[in-house]
Regions:
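N-terminal intrinsically disordered/low-complexity leader segments
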Residues: 1-8
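An amphipathic alpha-helix adjacent to DNA-recognition modules
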Residues: 9-20, 29-30, 41, 50-74, ...
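Hydrophobic pocket-lining residues that define ligand/cofactor binding sites across diverse proteins
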Residues: 23
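Residues within the helices of the helix-turn-helix
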Residues: 34
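The alpha-helix within a helix-turn-helix
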Residues: 37
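Short functional hotspots where side chains directly engage DNA or cofactors
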Residues: 44
């Protein structure tokens, strides 16, 4: 991953974390792009470079959460399989 890709990825993660934090406080329907940008400490114009709207961010954030969640199982599954193989 080059420097530009890394920066893009890090910004996306900041948006994901900002949305998750805001979702702890209120329903998705009431979260604004301005609030997300403020929480992520990123300009609004940067938001629109990444997403068309808040629904796009929600889709990506859902994938981000699920990928992190399932990563715990893949490690455990491999160790379980290794135990049965012995």
């Amino acid at each position: 991953m080059n420097k530009s890709e890394s920066r893009y990825f890090n910004t996306a993660v900041r948006f994901n974390k900002a949305l998750l934090s805001l979702l702890e406080k209120k329903p998705f329907e009431y979260i604004t792009i301005s609030e997300i940008c403020e929480k992520a400490e990123v300009n609004r114009s940067t938001f629109y470079l990444h997403y068309e709207n808040t629904s796009d961010l929600l889709k990506e954030t859902t994938t981000y959460v699920l990928d992190n969640f399932t990563s715990y199982f893949s490690v455990d599954a491999e160790s379980i399989i290794a135990q049965f193989a012995n």
